[in-house]
């Protein structure tokens, strides 16, 4: 199944990332976009469509100059001329790079790549700035059982705010207070599944949630998949710090692919840009 990833937004609220696409903000050695792609690839979905916008060159150049050595163990021999990787990240990925406009919204970006989804009855999509350990096949099974046009992940917000209840008739008297993530509030966590019919609901210049989703709701064609496992978005510098802490401590729940290895394979050192630049 193809995976549409929205990569055109800015990281304005993330320190030192104001001028790059937010999905290119790094978690460990790789951008969060890579972590999202690894998640989907783990479940067999390796055909990606990247909806590019602001600083599209950053995304393109990252993959054009991709080095497997950064995130994989390897053996260097033959005086630096022979490289054997124990694992490979993107060898079997197919990536379509689509410029979808500098200031386009999500609805416009999705509509712009409709032509690359020809023949697909359904597809996956993601904001590319959130991570989860969700067993994706479970969400897909739920989607197929419900037989609706669209589905997205419904998660509890990871916020430090508290929900406050005020007593009726006395708006100054607090009747309850609790952490927002302990209540009944759920938010749109992304991780969309769409039938191709979604394009019938998108009008020109409409944001995905404001227009198309409202029409889907009116026709009872939008479902949410409730998930209480790990989910974390990256909207602020604090969010990034949290993900970096999990990654650095070896407890990154979203790395569902960690148990799988692809075996050792030989690589042309000249094609490994990071290695060739450091070995001389």
Spell out what each predicted region is.
Residues 32-36, 108-112, 212:
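Well-ordered alpha-helical segments embedded in enzymatic catalytic cores
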Residues 28, 54-55, 101, 156, ...:
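Short beta->alpha linker loops
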Residues 121-124, 131-144, 156-160, 169-269:
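Catalytic-core segments of class I nucleotidyltransferases/pyrophosphorylases
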């Amino acid at each position: 199944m193809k995976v549409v990833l929205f990569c055109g937004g800015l990281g304005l609220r993330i320190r030192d990332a104001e001028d790059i696409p937010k999905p290119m903000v790094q978690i460990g050695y790789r951008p969060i976009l890579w972590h999202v792609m690894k998640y989907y690839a783990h479940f067999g979905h390796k055909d990606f469509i990247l909806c590019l916008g602001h600083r599209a060159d950053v995304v393109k150049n990252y993959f054009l100059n991709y080095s497997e050595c950064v995130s994989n163990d390897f053996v260097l021999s033959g005086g630096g001329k022979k490289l054997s990787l124990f694992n490979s990240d993107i060898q079997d990925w197919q990536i379509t790079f689509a410029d979808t406009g500098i200031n386009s919204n999500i609805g416009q970006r999705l509509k712009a790549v409709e032509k690359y989804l020809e023949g697909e009855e359904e597809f996956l999509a993601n904001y590319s700035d959130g991570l989860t350990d969700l067993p994706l096949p479970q969400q897909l099974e739920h989607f197929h059982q419900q037989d609706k046009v669209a589905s997205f992940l419904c998660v509890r917000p990871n916020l430090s705010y508290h929900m406050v209840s005020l007593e009726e008739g006395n708006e100054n008297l607090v009747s309850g207070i609790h952490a927002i993530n302990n209540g009944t509030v759920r938010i749109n966590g992304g991780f969309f599944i769409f039938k191709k019919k979604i394009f019938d609901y998108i009008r020109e210049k409409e944001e995905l949630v404001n227009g198309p989703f409202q029409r889907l709701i009116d026709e009872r064609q939008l479902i949410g998949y409730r998930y209480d496992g790990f989910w974390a978005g990256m909207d602020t510098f604090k969010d990034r710090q949290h993900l970096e802490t999990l990654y650095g401590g070896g407890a990154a729940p979203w790395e569902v692919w960690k148990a799988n290895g692809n075996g050792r394979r030989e690589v042309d050192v000249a094609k490994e840009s990071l290695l060739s630049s450091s070995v001389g």
